[in-house]
């Protein structure tokens, strides 16, 4: 009998690196079939909150809203000099950006409201 395990990950290079060997049958997993669910991180966050996957990538921000998931000892993708990064056109400091946001004259693109990038942005702008 084959045990099926759904594994959610993004198409990003760091996730692809972690799952390459399994996805390309470079590793034998006797009795286990991995169902790869490849989605953007915001969709994976929502799937985790709804308990739709056995194993998944999830933002630190979204993790607090999940049930029945444990953080694994490996697989994290977070560190110094590695996103999120805020860039702007022109010479703007954080106070300028905050004022423009409050006035509705500024837009900041984020990968999702449950992402760690969004949480860090909100903390940085306070």
Across the structure, where does each feature detected by a protein language model lie?
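Polyanion/phosphate-binding surface patch
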Residues: 76-77, 81-85
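N-terminal hydrophobic or amphipathic helices and topogenic motifs
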Residues: 1-77, 107
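Bilobed "Venus flytrap"/periplasmic-binding protein-like clamshell domains
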Residues: 4-24, 84-126
């Amino acid at each position: 009998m084959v045990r099926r395990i759904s594994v959610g990950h993004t198409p990003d290079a760091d996730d692809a690196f972690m799952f390459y060997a399994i996805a390309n049958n470079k590793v034998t997993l006797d009795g286990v079939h991995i169902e790869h669910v490849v989605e953007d991180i915001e969709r994976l966050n929502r799937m985790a909150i709804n308990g739709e996957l056995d194993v998944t990538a999830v933002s630190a921000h979204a993790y607090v809203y999940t049930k029945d998931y444990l953080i694994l000892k490996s697989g994290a993708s977070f560190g110094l000099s590695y996103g999120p990064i805020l860039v702007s056109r022109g010479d703007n400091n954080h106070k300028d950006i905050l004022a423009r946001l409050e006035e509705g004259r500024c837009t900041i693109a984020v990968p999702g409201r449950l992402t760690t990038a969004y949480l860090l942005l909100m903390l940085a702008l306070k």
